[in-house]
């Protein structure tokens, strides 16, 4: 009996111990479920897998590209054996000045935003099933490297037909562009609406980063239907209308009909407001009549703005939410953590918590302030660089040369110039991203130093490290300040004298003695000046890192700056291959070959006027109106002929003498 009772007691004790043992893990999930940490966004499982979306879009893009190829006839690659066969359409006419620029800008913005969305995604190519799921040890992550490299080629090919629909200039192409843009926009909107949150980086990062992508696709989904309606309404009249109002003719009209500046404008005194306005006009790009930025520069501006948004968004959502979570989770245990490092902020633990939260808030303010300052400076540098682009292009159009040292000044295209022209827009985007990141680091360190070494100690009256350092080293700084002040005062009052209105040296013995005696002190001053020089150089280079029109190296070493070297070759390529004067001349030649219409509107051009170039001199100038038609013809002839013959930038368009040529262009 006693043994059974003891056994029952033992079994009951074991049961109690097991119950108490299980109670230790009462917070563990039951049934093998995993407990999600607080604040972690679960992965979204869409109803339709993204692989199906991308497969359909890829097939649709290939079909659209095939249909566009049927509309384009191949004439350049094999003119003898392949004439009239379908050819691959061009996505963007980069060297054509009269094509719409909004479509390439929107497509490039969509492409760059899609590449930025590759950062948080797990599947770079969603329509391909990866070999192995991601593991905890990161082995599967390394296997995704080749797929990410392949994604850099997949997305340009995916959006290739979307851009090519605008270059074909056909109603069917506009219809295909409308369908393709609607498909892309519908897929993106459906995905963002079904899964607005993502567990990577920040829960709304994918949604915020896709805003430029949605904006570009939304514009394309409206632009293509509008062009389709216009093609049905106007027909082929739109092409001739665009040809008559071409940029090249406007450029020549502005160039050959410049009004003389009034002499009073140079002698009148400008006030402060007018001087400020002139400085604003020279610092900020304002569109001017008769000049249009090349398409490559327009794309660079669009991608720079998109890069500023994407990098700023990544820097913001990658750091600020983490700081806010840390500040919200501060408890009294932080006092023990700081005491372990020998830091005692206060005897009251609650006061320590408030101080730590206040310092974390100051850290967040410094970070956001540095980010705002970096974005503003990058944007201002972008706007100011457009003025430099316009000045350099106008100089090259007039036949000038850029002073960049030993680089060749030949206007003809070369292998290096073509490579630089191809990579200019991509380089500009990369320089902007890296420049914004470097500025953020430098400005954050600067604001952090000012906040925690100057403002916060003075506000709380404790941890005055900077003031203690200045208190202990004031003789050193006072000596340097007195040395600089006394040398400047002596140079002005003792060693400089004016004779007959001309300054000259005096008291040379005292000057030599002071120079010898103050040499050790000047070494210390030079050390401080060298540190200040390094700081200024770092700030200047960080601010101007995103600008390719400026060299970060001296003029003699400008060829070693790859960004500036690429920019100069890009300008030469643009000036030699898309010169407005040569384009206008070719347009006039093509126009004279057309049959003369029966009825010419008032704004139209007669055949004789086209041959003589009189339409380039249609101006409201009274002097030009008072002159006879022969005088206008002479000015047009000499102006255009002199530009075509004596402008070095147009040498690339010249051909050798034709054998057996006859006057007036007749061929035997």
UniProtKB/Swiss-Prot annotation:
<feature type="topological domain" description="Cytoplasmic">
    <location>
        <begin position="496"/>
        <end position="510"/>
    </location>
</feature>
<keyword id="KW-0325">Glycoprotein</keyword>
<feature type="topological domain" description="Cytoplasmic">
    <location>
        <begin position="73"/>
        <end position="101"/>
    </location>
</feature>
<feature type="transmembrane region" description="Helical">
    <location>
        <begin position="146"/>
        <end position="166"/>
    </location>
</feature>
<feature type="topological domain" description="Extracellular">
    <location>
        <begin position="445"/>
        <end position="474"/>
    </location>
</feature>
<keyword id="KW-1003">Cell membrane</keyword>
<dbReference type="GO" id="GO:0005886">
    <property type="term" value="C:plasma membrane"/>
</dbReference>
<feature type="topological domain" description="Cytoplasmic">
    <location>
        <begin position="228"/>
        <end position="296"/>
    </location>
</feature>
<feature type="transmembrane region" description="Helical">
    <location>
        <begin position="424"/>
        <end position="444"/>
    </location>
</feature>
<keyword id="KW-0683">Retinol-binding</keyword>
<dbReference type="GO" id="GO:0034633">
    <property type="term" value="P:retinol transport"/>
</dbReference>
<feature type="transmembrane region" description="Helical">
    <location>
        <begin position="207"/>
        <end position="227"/>
    </location>
</feature>
<feature type="topological domain" description="Extracellular">
    <location>
        <begin position="191"/>
        <end position="206"/>
    </location>
</feature>
<feature type="glycosylation site" description="N-linked (GlcNAc...) asparagine">
    <location>
        <position position="8"/>
    </location>
</feature>
<keyword id="KW-0845">Vitamin A</keyword>
<feature type="transmembrane region" description="Helical">
    <location>
        <begin position="102"/>
        <end position="122"/>
    </location>
</feature>
<dbReference type="GO" id="GO:0034632">
    <property type="term" value="F:retinol transmembrane transporter activity"/>
</dbReference>
<feature type="region of interest" description="Interaction with RBP1">
    <location>
        <begin position="236"/>
        <end position="294"/>
    </location>
</feature>
<feature type="topological domain" description="Cytoplasmic">
    <location>
        <begin position="167"/>
        <end position="169"/>
    </location>
</feature>
<feature type="topological domain" description="Cytoplasmic">
    <location>
        <begin position="390"/>
        <end position="423"/>
    </location>
</feature>
<keyword id="KW-0472">Membrane</keyword>
<dbReference type="Pfam" id="PF14752">
    <property type="entry name" value="RBP_receptor"/>
</dbReference>
<feature type="intramembrane region" description="Helical">
    <location>
        <begin position="511"/>
        <end position="548"/>
    </location>
</feature>
<feature type="transmembrane region" description="Helical">
    <location>
        <begin position="369"/>
        <end position="389"/>
    </location>
</feature>
<feature type="compositionally biased region" description="Polar residues">
    <location>
        <begin position="1"/>
        <end position="15"/>
    </location>
</feature>
<feature type="topological domain" description="Extracellular">
    <location>
        <begin position="318"/>
        <end position="368"/>
    </location>
</feature>
<feature type="topological domain" description="Extracellular">
    <location>
        <begin position="1"/>
        <end position="51"/>
    </location>
</feature>
<feature type="topological domain" description="Cytoplasmic">
    <location>
        <begin position="549"/>
        <end position="668"/>
    </location>
</feature>
<comment type="function">
    <text>Functions as a retinol transporter. Accepts all-trans retinol from the extracellular retinol-binding protein RBP4, facilitates retinol transport across the cell membrane, and then transfers retinol to the cytoplasmic retinol-binding protein RBP1. Retinol uptake is enhanced by LRAT, an enzyme that converts retinol to all-trans retinyl esters, the storage forms of vitamin A.</text>
</comment>
<feature type="transmembrane region" description="Helical">
    <location>
        <begin position="297"/>
        <end position="317"/>
    </location>
</feature>
<feature type="region of interest" description="Disordered">
    <location>
        <begin position="1"/>
        <end position="28"/>
    </location>
</feature>
<comment type="subunit">
    <text>Homodimer. Interacts with JAK2 and STAT5. Interacts (via extracellular domains) with RBP4. Interacts (via cytoplasmic domains) with RBP1.</text>
</comment>
<keyword id="KW-0675">Receptor</keyword>
<dbReference type="GO" id="GO:0016918">
    <property type="term" value="F:retinal binding"/>
</dbReference>
<dbReference type="GO" id="GO:0038023">
    <property type="term" value="F:signaling receptor activity"/>
</dbReference>
<feature type="transmembrane region" description="Helical">
    <location>
        <begin position="52"/>
        <end position="72"/>
    </location>
</feature>
<dbReference type="GO" id="GO:0043010">
    <property type="term" value="P:camera-type eye development"/>
</dbReference>
<feature type="transmembrane region" description="Helical">
    <location>
        <begin position="170"/>
        <end position="190"/>
    </location>
</feature>
<keyword id="KW-0597">Phosphoprotein</keyword>
<keyword id="KW-1133">Transmembrane helix</keyword>
<dbReference type="GO" id="GO:0071939">
    <property type="term" value="P:vitamin A import into cell"/>
</dbReference>
<feature type="topological domain" description="Extracellular">
    <location>
        <begin position="123"/>
        <end position="145"/>
    </location>
</feature>
